């Protein structure tokens, strides 16, 4: 399942990043603390994306980015 399909308020574990070899995207997510084995929670959803909680931070990510995060 992708983060775009995840339920709001539930904690998930990141299984993988499906970035199709896009190292810039992988590096960006890694800088947020989003990598395999880390917990992630969808805090809320908007039409353009969602707000996620990773470690001690909250981040607004778009739908394409959420679809690349496998949980």
List PLM regions with ranges.
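Short, conserved secondary-structure segments in the cores of folded domains
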Residues: 2, 28-31
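Short, structured beta-strand/loop micro-motifs enriched in basic residues and often containing a Trp
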Residues: 11-25
């Amino acid at each position: 399942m992708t983060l775009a399909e995840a339920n709001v308020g539930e904690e998930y574990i990141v299984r993988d990043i499906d970035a199709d070899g896009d190292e810039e995207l992988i590096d960006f997510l890694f800088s947020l603390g989003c990598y395999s084995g880390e917990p992630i929670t969808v805090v809320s959803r908007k039409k353009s994306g969602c707000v996620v909680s990773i470690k001690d931070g909250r981040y607004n990510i778009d739908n394409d980015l959420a679809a690349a995060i496998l949980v």
